[in-house]
Amino acid sequence: MKAIGIILAGGNNDGRLGVLTDHRAAAALPIGSCYRAIDFTLSNMSNSGIGKVAVLTQYNSRSLRDHLMSSKWWDFGRKQGGLFVFTPYTSNAGSTWFRGTADSIYQNMTFLKRSNEEYVVITSGDSVYKMDYRKVLEYHKESSTSPAPKEKAPASKYLSLKARN
């Protein structure tokens, strides 16, 4: 199943992690001796066969960018698609800082439109867990779950999902 990965790693965390994120993004927080929080999500993507991954960053992103650019642990070579890091930019079209997760994806819509993948897996970059996204995509494909609605929905800060066994 062809999928592209989007990792949301740009939030300012609204102070939920206190001084730990004063000078770095939550996704760049050290875990163990040589890992960062984002490494778990990147490993999940790689182990799920997702070879093209975009990391969307914003606040305090230097440490995260340095880590992503210096590591080749996840096997996102150009032949498989690659690892891309996007930050907000300004252009003649007047782009601004991301105004939330949906806006960060919207501002990078060109990247998605140019991809040939059938599915998009969107995850957080600061959560530590192990998951095979192929199983999630298979469930989505086999279930009666309909695609996300195309009509405009009211903006929300958080999204709640209920998991079924």
Protein language model features and the residues they cover:
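Unchanged
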Residues: 1-165
